[in-house]
Every structure is written in structure tokens, then in C-alpha cells.
């Protein structure tokens, strides 16, 4: 298992997997952390997966991922079209995507939704992440939203002013 550090280590971070239920979940939830990691480990490969989208939002999601990932050495961006709000009912098909993903990549670090998130789609992705990637370092991100389900984080990543401004600029793009 990768030992997490924002500084240079004997074991450099090489592969990150980002999982988001909806367009802009990853950017809002862990975009600043990703920008910090990319600046520290530019030789990264990032797999960026968004599970719910439509044609217009898929274009926006891809453009946003491209902006956030412009500093990495390689990337794969996938946007699926699962129906928003129905992940619990599409769980078997989504699980099949996770099983294929497990065969395709072996990430050092995975970002997924917080397990206590009140949105059903977010919870499904969290459960499938922990079920599928049992021997990986998994960090959960929270998304501030109307139902106020921000918990007590066990990891806080300080962002520099420049990183914060970059994240905001990308989100407004």
C-alpha cells in the first residue's frame, strides 16, 4: 500500500483513481488536493471517472477534467451515462464497471465520495470503492451541499492561495 505524503518520498506517487458520481463532484470534493498532488508528482497517471452525465454535461465534465489534469504525464477520462439518483437500482451494472476497472488499473491512491454522504449515488460509489479496492489507499472527499452532510474530516489538506485560486478558476470555467 502506498504511504501517503505530500513531500518527496522514497516511493513516489504514480497512479491516482478519481471517482465521482456526477459532473464536478471530483473537482469540488478534492480538486485542490489533486492540484497539490499534481504539482508535487508531475509524472502521475490519473484515471478520472464520472458515472452520471448527459451529452452536454459530459462535454463540460471532460473539459473540466482536462483543465485539472493538465500537469500530469498521462490520464484517462471516462464519463458514463448512469441516471442521476438511481445508482442504488443500477448497482449491479455499476459494480461490473468497478470490476473491469480493478483489472485495468492498480492505483496508489483512490479518491471517492464520503461514506456518510446523504446522496444515494455518492454512497453507492463509496461502498463499491471499498468493496472493490480492498488493498488500496482510499481517501474520501466531502461535497458541501444543501443537505449539509459535512462530517468531521480525518484528513485536511491545506491549499496555498495559488492552488485555491486555480481551483476556483477551473470551477468557474
Which residues make up each language-model segment?
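Active-site beta-strand->loop->alpha-helix modules in alpha/beta enzyme cores, enriched
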Residues: 1-23, 27-146, 151
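A conserved mid-domain beta-alpha-beta active-site/ligand-binding segment of alpha/beta enzyme cores
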Residues: 157-173
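Phosphate-binding/catalytic loops
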Residues: 147-161
Amino acid at each position: 500500500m502506498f504511504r501517503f505524503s505530500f513531500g518527496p518520498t522514497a516511493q513516489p506517487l504514480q497512479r491516482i483513481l478519481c471517482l465521482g458520481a456526477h459532473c464536478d463532484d471530483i473537482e469540488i470534493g478534492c480538486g485542490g488536493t489533486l492540484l497539490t498532488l499534481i504539482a508535487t508528482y508531475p509524472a502521475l497517471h490519473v484515471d478520472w471517472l464520472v458515472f452520471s452525465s448527459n451529452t452536454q454535461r459530459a462535454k463540460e465534465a471532460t473539459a473540466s477534467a482536462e483543465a485539472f489534469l493538465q500537469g500530469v504525464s498521462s490520464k484517462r477520462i471516462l464519463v458514463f451515462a448512469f441516471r442521476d439518483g438511481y445508482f442504488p437500482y443500477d448497482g449491479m451494472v455499476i459494480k461490473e464497471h468497478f470490476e473491469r476497472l480493478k483489472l485495468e488499473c492498480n492505483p496508489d491512491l483512490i479518491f471517492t465520495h464520503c461514506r456518510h454522504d446523504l446522496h444515494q449515488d455518492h454512497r453507492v460509489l463509496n461502498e463499491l470503492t471499498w468493496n472493490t479496492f480492498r488493498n488500496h489507499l482510499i481517501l474520501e472527499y466531502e461535497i458541501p451541499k444543501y443537505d449539509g452532510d459535512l462530517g468531521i474530516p480525518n484528513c485536511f489538506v491545506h491549499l496555498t492561495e495559488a492552488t485555491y485560486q486555480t481551483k476556483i478558476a477551473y470551477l468557474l470555467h
